[in-house]
Amino acid sequence: MSTDSDPLAAAGAAEVPLVGPVVCAALRIEARAVRRGLTRTPVVVVGYRARRAARLPGACAALVTVGFGGALDERLRPGDVLVADEIRGPGGTAAPCSAPRLLAEELIRDGLSAQVGPLVTTDRVVRGRERAVLAAQGARAVDMESALVAARAGGLPVAALRVVVDGPRHPLWHPGTIGRGLAARRVLARTGPALERWSVLLVRGEDGPAGA
């Protein structure tokens, strides 16, 4: 078994309650990056399109999905962090997120550029007209996993953050993507402390309403 999933292997099998959140990442590179800033929070690699989401434990305080994403809103630049206030999935489903503004404030405290808005999950990389359609519907960024993770939350609080790599003016299939990806990885590695402070406030009940 990969070391990326070891922290939860025993807890997930035995359903040992976890007092804090579980962080989910699609890719190992994302998991390794976010883990650098975490001191006590387990990270699970759920795979492309969350194909291994079944390994997520059912007994934890919250599910947090993190990683790289694409901007739909031109106001989001590469390296910015989009904190979802809702996660939109296929068929018009939408999962509200817990205390997104509080999480954004904690990220900003650490010197990161964070904004709040809807995140949409698609089943493929979107470009051109598809991006424009999603943006017109109010979504600010896109990924391929968060809604699938949220669907398994079973009533647990959910949060999602995506570090922007590409966008309307920064196409994914471009030589500059390599540099933007490396920069995004550095940003993702700095999100851990804010995530853990946010989770403490959430457990204490200081989160306020979902849109707060």
Q: Model segments located where?
A:
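Glycine-rich phosphate- or other oxyanion-binding loops that anchor nucleotides, phosphorylated ligands
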Residues: 2, 6, 16-212
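Glycine-/acidic-rich phosphate or pyrophosphate-binding loops and their flanking alpha/beta elements
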Residues: 12-13
